[in-house]
């Protein structure tokens, strides 16, 4: 969208990634480049914005509605900082101008409600689709919102996978650029099944 009116030039600069902190510097660099490289230019106006792209997912899967990109955060075992990495990644993306959601898929140790400082129960208008909770600018859903804090989880295998699929697909995510999935620790059937059924665009593996 380039417009030229005599010595006045204006155009749009659109980033396809979260870069709110870089917009001002890029705008100034673009203005300086036009003034130094194009003769006769007196005034330059640059409209710098962010429009995050949707990236490719696994074959046979389609991106979820209202979610551009899903990033899975996993680890080979518990206690290595996976959930901390997931929440810090989410908050960093929010700080850079992205719309971010967090799915706490760690059924046996849901920690995202505590990390995001969110309490209470999510609401549902129709008894099926659940509105996500929100904290620090992050839309969040966790099994921790739906059960009592001291209730032990005795689910295994297919029950866990089914519950996580419901949390993923029956949450009313609102126009997300990124959905961060805090995976259960380990590399068992649950993780393999989720990786085959969830349209993941990227992954972070937290190692020891």
Regions found by a protein language model. Give the residues of each.
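A short interface-forming secondary-structure element
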Residues: 2-35, 40, 47
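Conserved catalytic-core segment of NTP-binding enzymes
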Residues: 28, 61, 170-173, 177-178, ...
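Residue-level signature of catalytic and energy-coupling elements of molecular machines
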Residues: 34, 67, 78, 104, ...
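Gly/Ala-rich phosphate-binding loop of Rossmann-like dinucleotide-binding domains
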Residues: 35, 90, 94, 195
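Short, basic phosphate-binding NTP loop
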Residues: 37, 42-69
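Walker A/P-loop phosphate-binding motif and the immediately C-terminal alpha-helix
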Residues: 70-107
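Short glycine/serine/threonine-rich phosphate/pyrophosphate-binding segments
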Residues: 79-89, 110-113, 183-191
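Phosphate-binding loop that captures ATP/GTP phosphates
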Residues: 93-157, 161-169
């Amino acid at each position: 969208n380039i417009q030229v009116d005599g010595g006045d030039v204006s155009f749009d600069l659109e980033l396809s990634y979260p870069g709110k902190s870089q917009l001002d510097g890029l705008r100034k660099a673009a203005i300086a480049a036009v003034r130094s490289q194009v003769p006769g230019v007196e005034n330059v106006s640059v409209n710098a914005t962010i429009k995050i792209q949707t990236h490719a997912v696994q074959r046979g899967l389609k991106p979820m509605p209202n979610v551009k990109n899903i990033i899975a955060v996993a680890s080979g075992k518990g206690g290595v900082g996976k959930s901390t990495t997931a929440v810090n990644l989410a908050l960093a993306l929010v700080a850079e101008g992205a719309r971010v959601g967090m799915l706490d898929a760690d059924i046996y140790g849901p920690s995202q409600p505590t990390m995001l400082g969110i309490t209470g129960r999510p609401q549902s208008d129709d008894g099926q689709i659940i509105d996500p909770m929100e904290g620090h600018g992050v839309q969040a859903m966790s099994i921790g919102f739906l059960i009592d804090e001291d209730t032990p989880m005795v689910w295994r295998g297919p029950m866990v996978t089914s519950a996580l699929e419901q949390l993923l697909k029956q949450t009313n995510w609102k126009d997300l650029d990124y959905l961060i999935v805090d995976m259960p620790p380990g590399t068992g059937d649950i993780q393999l099944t989720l990786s085959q059924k969830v349209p993941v665009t990227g992954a972070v593996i937290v190692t020891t």
